From Swiss-Prot:
Superkingdom: Bacteria
Organism listed in the record: Wolinella succinogenes (strain ATCC 29543 / DSM 1740 / CCUG 13145 / JCM 31913 / LMG 7466 / NCTC 11488 / FDC 602W) (Vibrio succinogenes)
UniProt key word Repeat: yes
Cofactor, free-text remark: Binds 4 [4Fe-4S] clusters.
UniProt-recorded name of the protein: Formate dehydrogenase iron-sulfur subunit
GO molecular function: 4 iron, 4 sulfur cluster binding; electron transfer activity; metal ion binding
Amino acid sequence: MESQARVKFYCDEARCIDCHGCDVACKEAHHLPVGVNRRRVVTLNEGLVGKEKSLSIACMHCSDAPCAQVCPVDCFYVRADGIVLHDKEKCIGCGYCLYACPFGAPQFPKSGIFGSRGPMDKCTFCAGGPEETHSEKEYKLYGQNRIAEGKVPVCAAMCSTKALLAGDSDSISLIIRERVLKRGSGTASVPYTWSQAYKD
């Protein structure tokens, strides 16, 4: 990916086929422990023929991230491109970020003999963490750093129907607009695209 103003994810529910390729790719690429799902597919109206819609959900890297606002140890930080990351070595596992996140993105692996929470884990937009880029420590704590390699996140790269889009908000917004107009839905549904929802 080239230099962006602000990066975002968008899942086109008209294209998502509930294959779980995105969440499996994420889990495999980052070697996530059992119980930690940085990305998940949710089906709305399940069982209602013709009304089912599936969405791939993860951290949305909010412009004004509520998780960062409630963290008592300030383990969150926002990169210049808008990616919201956290420092696992600062995290105390309190869970405030989970309660604040409208997407349920923060995940807490169990650790210790009594099943206490370990440091929080969440989607990193495949941008690693605060450790040295491509270091063994960064990979162990945060997984692949595809952004440093100029690639899109693995979940979006593996989406066979291109329902899951990742990249700079302007480019994603243009793709969404084109798709909506091609579907014949008109411009009535366009205002909910990233260019309006997330002002830089």
